[in-house]
UniProtKB/Swiss-Prot annotation:
Domain commentary: Has 3 domains, the large (RuvB-L) and small ATPase (RuvB-S) domains and the C-terminal head (RuvB-H) domain. The head domain binds DNA, while the ATPase domains jointly bind ATP, ADP or are empty depending on the state of the subunit in the translocation cycle. During a single DNA translocation step the structure of each domain remains the same, but their relative positions change.
Protein name: Holliday junction branch migration complex subunit RuvB
Alphabetically ordered keywords of this record: ATP-binding, Cytoplasm, DNA damage, DNA recombination, DNA repair, DNA-binding, Hydrolase, Nucleotide-binding
EC numbers, comma separated: 3.6.4.-
Function in brief: The RuvA-RuvB-RuvC complex processes Holliday junction (HJ) DNA during genetic recombination and DNA repair, while the RuvA-RuvB complex plays an important role in the rescue of blocked DNA replication forks via replication fork reversal (RFR). RuvA specifically binds to HJ cruciform DNA, conferring on it an open structure. The RuvB hexamer acts as an ATP-dependent pump, pulling dsDNA into and through the RuvAB complex. RuvB forms 2 homohexamers on either side of HJ DNA bound by 1 or 2 RuvA tetramers; 4 subunits per hexamer contact DNA at a time.
Small ATPAse domain (RuvB-S): region residues: 202-273
Region (Large ATPase domain (RuvB-L)): 13-201
Gene3D superfamilies: 1.10.8.60, P-loop containing nucleotide triphosphate hydrolases, Winged helix-like DNA-binding domain superfamily/Winged helix DNA-binding domain
Length: 352
């Protein structure tokens, strides 16, 4: 069931979708087992950098829950991967002085899986379900009464032998996380008392995260270098820390130093085919392919076929950042480069 306890303690060729992209916000195996990354996690909401409005709302809700001695209302966190949804779930549990159990929706395959999770909870505990939009219908429906009335309504047997059984549950808080809010059914979405979007981080917030982590791993990283790295991290702490670790590799192995300068960052990222905009080879091939269409809109499926990639991956992994930085626009007829995007890709013809 993939339940985890909450003890916080190249060349320029198109990348295939199963290859690691340093600028992909999805977590990779190395990051799951990296002890330094675990040590870098904040222990309280106050230590959590960024998301000030979200933290303020959570602080009020948590304090009100403690004051009334009631369970915190169920919380839905939505936003792009790598912004801290799992970390926030741990912090909420910590602030409530309780435990947090984690499950991922794809691992909850059968109704009995969610039943086992719910029956294993104690009074006041937090259950965090990542990718909650991927719950199957039967499992989701079991959550309705559990979230609303803290009970399970189970149907057992078949045909004439069918009988219903109600099991009371301890009062708990469900925290759901999703990157696809629109994919969550209305009945499930409406049962969350608190729904909050996790925003991208600004440069100063990412810079502080990088400086804190550099001290933890004994790197000399100055303000200017940390700010330069923050600017190409796509507003995402996970990407920022991953890039810093790769820059550290280059610094220690190639340059034999623990001091990170702006020039060293440029050389290191250039070796990984990442430019000063934070774009990699897949981004550039995507932009170049559209640019060849001479300002005529082109459909996503045609782009995917031309690049040999999955259209869903391009839509949800590649395009959002290109739109965010003003290089790409979506129209009813297809994708188009903006003037900025065309200027950028034309200038990259000889760079990589």
């Amino acid at each position: 069931m993939a339940i985890i306890s909450s003890n916080i303690g190249d060349n320029d060729l198109p990348l295939r979708k199963k290859e690691l992209r340093l600028v992909d916000s999805k977590i990779i195996p190395e990051e799951k087992r990296n002890n330094n990354l675990n040590l870098a996690r904040p222990l309280t909401l106050k230590e959590f950098i960024g998301q000030e409005q979200l933290k303020s709302s959570l602080r009020i809700a948590i304090d009100a829950s403690i004051f009334r001695k009631e369970p915190l209302e169920h919380i839905l966190l939505y936003g792009q991967p790598g912004l801290g949804k799992t970390t926030l779930a741990f912090l909420i549990a910590h602030e409530l002085n309780t435990k947090c159990k984690i499950a991922t929706a794809p691992a909850i395959e059968r109704p009995r899986d969610i039943v086992g999770l719910l029956l294993g909870l104690k009074e006041g505990e937090v259950l965090f379900i990542d990718e909650i939009h991927r719950l199957n219908r039967l499992t989701e429906e079991l959550l309705y009464s559990a979230m609303e009335d803290f009970r399970l309504d189970l149907t057992m047997g078949a045909n004439k032998g069918t009988r219903c059984r109600t099991i009371n549950l301890p009062r708990f808080t469900l925290i759901g996380a999703t990157t696809k809010l629109a994919s969550i059914s209305a009945p499930l979405r409406d049962r969350f008392g608190i729904s909050q979007k996790i925003e991208f981080y600004n440069y100063d917030e990412l810079k502080q995260i990088l400086l804190n982590f550099s001290r933890l791993i004994n790197l000399n990283l100055d303000d200017e270098a940390s700010y330069d790295l923050a600017k190409i991290s796509r507003g995402t702490p996970r990407i920022a820390l991953r890039l810093l670790r790769r820059v550290r590799d280059y610094a220690q192995v190639v340059m034999k130093t623990n001091t990170i300068s702006v020039n060293l960052i440029k050389k290191a990222l250039n070796s990984y085919q990442i430019d000063d905009k934070g774009l990699d080879s897949l981004d550039r091939h995507y932009l170049s392919f559209i640019n060849q269409n001479n300002n005529i809109p082109i459909g996503l499926d045609s782009i995917a076929a031309g690049l040999g990639d999955d259209s869903s991956m391009l839509e949800f992994v590649v395009e959002p950042y290109l739109i965010k930085i003003g290089f790409l626009t979506r129209t009813p007829r297809g994708r188009l480069l903006t003037a900025l995007g065309k200027k950028y890709i034309d200038s990259k013809n000889d760079d990589f």
